[in-house]
A protein has these predicted regions:
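Class I SAM-dependent methyltransferase SAM/SAH-binding core
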Residues: 1-31
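A short acidic, Gly/Pro-enriched loop at the edge of an enzyme's catalytic core
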Residues: 29-39
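Hydrophobic beta-strand segment of the Class I
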Residues: 39-40, 128
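Residues lining the SAM
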Residues: 41-45, 73
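A short glycine-rich, Lys/Arg-flanked "PGG" loop and its adjoining helix->strand segment in the class I
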Residues: 54-66
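Conserved beta-strand signature within the Rossmann-like core of class I S-adenosyl-L-methionine
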Residues: 64-75
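C-terminal alpha-helical "lid/dimerization" subdomain adjacent to the S-adenosyl-L-methionine
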Residues: 75-131
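Core SAM-dependent methyltransferase catalytic element
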Residues: 125-152
Length: 152
């Protein structure tokens, strides 16, 4: 997977405010984590094999101090399959309204089939619990995306 994000404005703001932050890219299963106060996983866990997700969260838990936070932003699915289908259709309509063609939406969906494996919010919360996180809260949801915060 390749991607590029222009973080220059953020880096300038961070430097001005004297905020210490690391951004890294790599295989989280192979990366040694140092201690962080907050770790943000944005659209990451959904691409990790389901069998490896709990060990990734344990690894993150162990790299946080007591009171440290994980912020998890993920594409989700709904338990109710009818609702899930409706929300996905709403998401595709949203993408069309924002300039995506039906063909590009279809091609991306096909490319991500069996690669992006979303969980329900409850399944993600359960994974966090099994990794020993506490105070697990869903704090934002839009269509089939959710933001969850948890504390070590």
């Amino acid at each position: 997977m390749q991607g590029w994000i222009n973080l220059n404005p953020w880096w300038k703001w961070r430097k001005k405010k004297k905020i210490s932050a690391d951004i890294w890219q790599g295989d989280i299963l192979q990366t040694r984590l140092k201690e962080y106060d907050v770790i943000i996983l944005s659209l990451v866990l959904q691409f990790i094999r389901p069998l490896d997700r709990e060990s990734v969260l344990h690894k993150i838990y162990n790299s946080l101090p007591v009171g440290g936070k994980i912020i998890l932003f993920e594409k989700i699915r709904y338990e109710d399959q009818v609702l899930d289908r409706k929300v996905i259709d709403m998401y595709y309509r949203f993408k069309e309204k924002n300039g995506y063609t039906k063909t590009s939406i279809y091609k991306k969906r096909e490319a991500l089939e069996n690669v992006l494996i979303p969980y329900t919010v409850e399944e993600n919360k359960e994974l966090l619990k099994r990794a020993h996180f506490k105070k697990i809260e869903e704090i934002y949801r839009y269509l089939n995306f959710a933001l969850i915060i948890a504390e070590r």
